C-alpha cells in the first residue's frame, strides 16, 4: 500500500500526459496514465511543433537528435519529407501569395507532426514501457496532496501522491477541483474536414500550389481555409481542411458553441451553401464545395480557451491536482502554441518532481507545485492571450491582407 501511495496518477494520454509519464518513467518515478478512450482512438491530425517546444523535449529525453523526431512524426516521412512548412499565406480567392518568409535565409524551425505518430514516439522514447490504462474515464477525485484518490466510472479506484490533470480543455479533473473555471468560448465559426486523395490526384490538384510544404494556408475576407497533410502512405495522402470565420451578428446560423457531439458530426445545409458561394481559387474550390464534402468526415469545432489564476493553481494543488496541457492553458488550434506548451509542461513538471525526489527520497509536493508553477504559469497564460490575439488577426478583412502584402513588397 505504501508503494501505491507514492504512485503519481496521470489523467489523459495526450501529448502532455505521455510526455510527463515518459520523463517520470525514465527517472524511475512510478506513475500510471489513465485514458478514457480506447487504444485505437485516432488523433491523426497534424500540429506544428516549434523549436522552443521540441528542442526542450529532445534535451530532456537524453539529447536526442532532431532527425529522430522528424523520421518518426513528420506527415511526409514515408516519402523522405521533414515536416516542412513554407509559413506562407495565400489569397484563397486568387491564389496570390500574400505573405511568405525569405526561404533562402530561413532554416527549418517548425516541424509539422502527425499527432498520433507523436504520441507513439513519446511513449517509445525509453527502455521501460509506460503503464497506460485505457477505458478509464474519471468520475471524481478525493483526498489531498500526498494522499489522493482517483475514482473512475468503471468502478476502479487508485490512490496516489499526486494527480496530474492532462485531460484537455474539457478537463474532468479541473471541473472536479475548480468548478468555477469554465472554458471561454471564442466567437468564431470553425469546421474541420478529413479526406483522402490518391498520390496522382494530390500531385495534380495540390502539389502545384503547396510545393513541398505540409500546409497550404488560404486566407480570405475574414475567413480562412488551410489545407494540411496529416499523413502520406505508399498509396494515399490523408489530408484535412478547416473553414473558420468570424461570427456574423447575433443570429448566425452556423455559430453553435453548445452543439452536442453527435450533432457536431452532421453537415448543416447552411455550411454547404456558404462554401459554394465563396468563389474560391484552386485547389480550395475543388475541395471545399457541397459535392466534395459528401465524401469527407466533417466536424464542428468549438474554439475555447482556458485561463487559470495562480490562486486557482494553488487551491488545486492543495487538493492533490496539478495541471499540464490544455486542461489549464487551452488556446486556439490555428495559430496557437498549445502543443508546444504541453510538451514544456511535461518537461518542467517531470524535472520538478525528479529534483524533489532526488533531494528527499520522496516527493516534497508543496515544493514541486511551487517550482513548477513558478515558471509555467506565466509562460502558458501569456501564450493563451498571445495565441488568441493572433487567431483573430488571422481572420482580418481582405483589405488589410492586401495592405500587408503591398507593404511586404516595398523595398526596405
Swiss-Prot record:
Where on the tree of life does the source sit, at the highest rank? Eukaryota
* This protein's pathway: Secondary metabolite biosynthesis
For the ligand (FAD), the binding residues are 35, 46, 119, 326, 339
Record GO terms (molecular function): FAD binding; monooxygenase activity
What the protein does comes down to: FAD-dependent monooxygenase; part of the gene cluster that mediates the biosynthesis of neosartoricin B, a prenylated anthracenone that probably exhibits T-cell antiproliferative activity, suggestive of a physiological role as an immunosuppressive agent. The non-reducing polyketide synthase nscA probably synthesizes and cyclizes the decaketide backbone. The hydrolase nscB then mediates the product release through hydrolysis followed by spontaneous decarboxylation. The prenyltransferase nscD catalyzes the addition of the dimethylallyl group to the aromatic C5.
**What's in the keyword line of the UniProt record?**
FAD, Flavoprotein, Glycoprotein, Monooxygenase, Oxidoreductase, Signal
Residue ranges of the TM segments: none
EC nos: 1.-.-.-
Matches recorded under InterPro entries: FAD-bd, FAD/NAD-bd_sf
Q: What class of enzyme is it?
A: oxidoreductase
Question: Where is carbohydrate linked to this protein?
Answer: 92, 170, 231
Organism for this UniProt entry: Trichophyton tonsurans (strain CBS 112818) (Scalp ringworm fungus)
Give the family this protein belongs to, as stated in its UniProt record: Belongs to the paxM FAD-dependent monooxygenase family.
Recall the taxonomic lineage recorded for the source organism. Eukaryota, Fungi, Dikarya, Ascomycota, Pezizomycotina
Q: Which cofactor does it need?
A: FAD
Designated name of the protein: FAD-dependent monooxygenase nscC
Signal peptide as annotated in the record: 1-21
Q: Which gene encodes it?
A: nscC
Amino acid at each position: 500500500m505504501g508503494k501505491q501511495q507514492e504512485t503519481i496518477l496521470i489523467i489523459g494520454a495526450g501529448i502532455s500526459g505521455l510526455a510527463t509519464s515518459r520523463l517520470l518513467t525514465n527517472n524511475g518515478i512510478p506513475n500510471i496514465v489513465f485514458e478514457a478512450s480506447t487504444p485505437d482512438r485516432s488523433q491523426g491530425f497534424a500540429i506544428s511543433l516549434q523549436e522552443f517546444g521540441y528542442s526542450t523535449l529532445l534535451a530532456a529525453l537524453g539529447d536526442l537528435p532532431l532527425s529522430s523526431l522528424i523520421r518518426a512524426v513528420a506527415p511526409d516521412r514515408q516519402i523522405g519529407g521533414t515536416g516542412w512548412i513554407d509559413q506562407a499565406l495565400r489569397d484563397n480567392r486568387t491564389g496570390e501569395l500574400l505573405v511568405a518568409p525569405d526561404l533562402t535565409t530561413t532554416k527549418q524551425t517548425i516541424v509539422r507532426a502527425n499527432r498520433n505518430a507523436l504520441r507513439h514516439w513519446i511513449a517509445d522514447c525509453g527502455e521501460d514501457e509506460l503503464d497506460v490504462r485505457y477505458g478509464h474515464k474519471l468520475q471524481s477525485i478525493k483526498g489531498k496532496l500526498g494522499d489522493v484518490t482517483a475514482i473512475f466510472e468503471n468502478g476502479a479506484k487508485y490512490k496516489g501522491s499526486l494527480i496530474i490533470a492532462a485531460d484537455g480543455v474539457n478537463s474532468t479533473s479541473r471541473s472536479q477541483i475548480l468548478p468555477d473555471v469554465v472554458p471561454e468560448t471564442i466567437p468564431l465559426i470553425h469546421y474541420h474536414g478529413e479526406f483522402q486523395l490518391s498520390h496522382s490526384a494530390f500531385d495534380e490538384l495540390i502539389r502545384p500550389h503547396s510545393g513541398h510544404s505540409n500546409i497550404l494556408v488560404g486566407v480570405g475576407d475574414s475567413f480562412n481555409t488551410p489545407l494540411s497533410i496529416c499523413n502520406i502512405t505508399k498509396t494515399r495522402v490523408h489530408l484535412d481542411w478547416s473553414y473558420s470565420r468570424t461570427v456574423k451578428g447575433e443570429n448566425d446560423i452556423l455559430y453553435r458553441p453548445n452543439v452536442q457531439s453527435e450533432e457536431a458530426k452532421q453537415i448543416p445545409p447552411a455550411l454547404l451553401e456558404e462554401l459554394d458561394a465563396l468563389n474560391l481559387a484552386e485547389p480550395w474550390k475543388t475541395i471545399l464545395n457541397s459535392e466534395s464534402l459528401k465524401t469527407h468526415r466533417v466536424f464542428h469545432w468549438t474554439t475555447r480557451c482556458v485561463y487559470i489564476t495562480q490562486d486557482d493553481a494553488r487551491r488545486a494543488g492543495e487538493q492533490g491536482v496539478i495541471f499540464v496541457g490544455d486542461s489549464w492553458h487551452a488556446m486556439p488550434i490555428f495559430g496557437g502554441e498549445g502543443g508546444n506548451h504541453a510538451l514544456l509542461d511535461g518537461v518542467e513538471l517531470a524535472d520538478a518532481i525528479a529534483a524533489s525526489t532526488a533531494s528527499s527520497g520522496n516527493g516534497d509536493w508543496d515544493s514541486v507545485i511551487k517550482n513548477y508553477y513558478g515558471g509555467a504559469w506565466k509562460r502558458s497564460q501569456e501564450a493563451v492571450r498571445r495565441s488568441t490575439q493572433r487567431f483573430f488577426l488571422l481572420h482580418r478583412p481582405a483589405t488589410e491582407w492586401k495592405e500587408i502584402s503591398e507593404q511586404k513588397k516595398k523595398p526596405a
